[in-house]
Amino acid sequence: MIIAQYTRARLVQYGFYARIEGIEFDPRNGVRFCFRMRQEQIRDWGRENLSGRQYGDLKAALRVADVAIQACVANGKVDVSKSVFPARGCVDIKANDAVAKVATQVREQLGLLLPLLEADCHRLYEAGQNVHGTREIALGDVRVTLTEEPCGDFDFGWSPQPGDTLDDLLGGGRYLNLRIRVFRAGRLIAEKVRKGVVDTGNSPHYGGIGRALLREAITINAA
């Protein structure tokens, strides 16, 4: 489980990953922060090399680290000085703290929701239907939505039918964007979009692919 996966991906995109190794979160082993520069050096580098929005993302990543560290300190799990970003090496925090409990709870709820969402979508396929809009499923305070967003057609004069093979569909069809969102207590904590999927009317886009997308999209800032 990566506590700052979203922000970390942004940092990779901005070429900053060479200087920050990462901020990782594992419910079983606690939190691991790996930096190659001190926090002040990181901010200085960002101020000089990033745009305003990128610099904002960088500061957000550091705030995530600060919040997680403070959560561990508050629970008496680790004694961390103010200089928690060493010039070399990393800070390891082994803790089963409140942050870990929240992430574990969300993970367990998603583990129950994903098969239900897949079964719900396959019931539609068996009836010869598509999602057509948004499907939603919830457990406790975790809610998952899956949205079908048509984004273009290529016409072959007839509509795909359940049971069509790939050869049947080579003449045309409809393109979809599939958008999966995960909410916790009403707050968006994960989102993934796959663009340009070919809609065959009965292929498991919302099941197997959707489940894989959702697992990939679990970006939980549990702090």
Per-region residue spans from a language model:
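Acidic interaction surfaces
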Residues: 1-223
